[in-house]
């Protein structure tokens, strides 16, 4: 008897639980037939010009029978060196470094347009977006929420593509430098075509931001336009001012005096969006299903987002009242120090946010991220200390980073042979930025030491690309947290790490960045199928008690607490109209 047959006849009482009265076979494929349909993505225009700091509305046209996935398509303007005001930066080198005759090769590299879009510009530019049916708001979401949700649900396979869709790339979020290569365009140009080349401008780029409304994430919840003959569907969009999306200064020198003080590049902040529109995936149904969809009433179990606004806190112990309704699947909260998002202070030389190249709207930790978005940070140069006063001043983006890290007690003095024990925080370090990537080596005037890049151009590109998802920031601002419902503890007090590590690990696809906290009432909150809720409509008093770290609210420091809740509701559609079954 063959071995396979021996296994086959080795059949006992326990096998009845596995193979008795079988219901499926692995040896004959089965499938189910589906209703015929077609799908097409069609552009929808806004009423009025969509631009930074404006509110625009798009009325969804009835091009198809159902409306499914919806994307914001927006084209960012180019930010280039021609935007530098005339006369800015003259004699900057001599004032900063004390040299009366800076080298000719330095001229024009002390000042320019140093600009970057803040992280995740596609998400950051969205202040608010909402869906209306017949004048009733059905759901409202925020760019901050989109970032948090994608931190929890985005798979590793999707991350690279999503980052490019929303503009979180080195081409857009890494600082420009006048010594870098020009932007490559579609027409004939002498600029390098390789994407790894650092650029002296932020290129005109089209972003695609997917909305996360209930009808966008599940085809079974697609909006039945054919059944809403008497109600219009509108999408209202609020865009942030450009000041909260862009960081652009005329110099990277961290020296404040009349000659060298960096200035805001006003022309860059006067730019408008090149284009903005929505793309909606329309579904076309076959005749029979189309008739049923139009004539029959419908009830959809939908998901909504609840957010009652920021709450300012300035002490370590806080009670946050939760004014939520409906059966909620989970609570998600972040605590963001105000110092992380001080957009005005980020343009003032000497401030921490200036040194790290702008505000950090998606930093939910209790410390500034001191790993800045700059190619310069990955190119180190050895140079004789005396040459700092007489040679090219294009040294110190990394030195300035080291100054910041030293001031934060992250590193000590830089002490290696031939450097003559120069403190990175000393005045002799001056200001400036690192040599261009094309500089292989050079002999400093009067010096005995060559300076040479410790990382190759290819290595620099690898480091910058991998650093997009790397951070040198703080810890979770939440030291402990506890939820109380009608005065009773829903769970015992837990450390903050339980809410930003254990809970996401248990209930979500992905472990998010530090500081994104959650507590889930559902087994699988990402799925539409309900798997557990807490009905906050039946809770009179819900309170989230938070103890925050000293780094977050110590001294005069303040922070904002944002608590989000995802809930179920019922959308009823009948007689050509639609509305919610349960209001707030």
From Swiss-Prot:
SUPFAM superfamilies: Group II dsDNA viruses VP (SSF49749). The keyword rRNA processing does not apply. One of its GO terms (molecular function) is structural molecule activity. It is found in: Virion. InterPro entries: Capsid_N, MCP_C, MCP_C_sf, VP_dsDNA_II. The keyword Ribonucleoprotein does not apply. Keywords: Capsid protein, Virion. One of its GO terms (cellular component) is viral capsid. Its main location: virion. Major protein of the capsid. Belongs to the NCLDV major capsid protein family. This is Major capsid protein. It comes from Chrysochromulina ericina virus (CeV01). The gene is MCP.
